[in-house]
């Protein structure tokens, strides 16, 4: 993993990435490709949904040939099985998300028949922002539970402003 900043903010990322596909595919694949493939169990999609990421799409208007950029929340990209809020003239050019702070708790999990070289049966990720003993913000996502990668808005809203306890 080349990014020192990502290693700093996501100390478990290298181990988590070992669960994604195989070494040759990881070396050839792209984050954008993982998103626009629209697999309901895409590991990196679930990871970045929990980061409440926004993507930037660059496109060309067909008639006027004018170039444009538009921003789409990753959670709004998926409209149905393999259906995206993205035209054939658009490409994904960047991904934006807030870096975790010292008050951030983040976890990604993947369940599959084999530990390595296997697609997920189900996967999930959660990002919590904690202030004292209260969850100030929550973002939860899951794959393998619907025809699209799911940002769990109701679960996220339910957790926000809840106290943290050992129970």
Give residue ranges: language-model regions:
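C-terminal structural segment of proteins
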Residues: 1-167
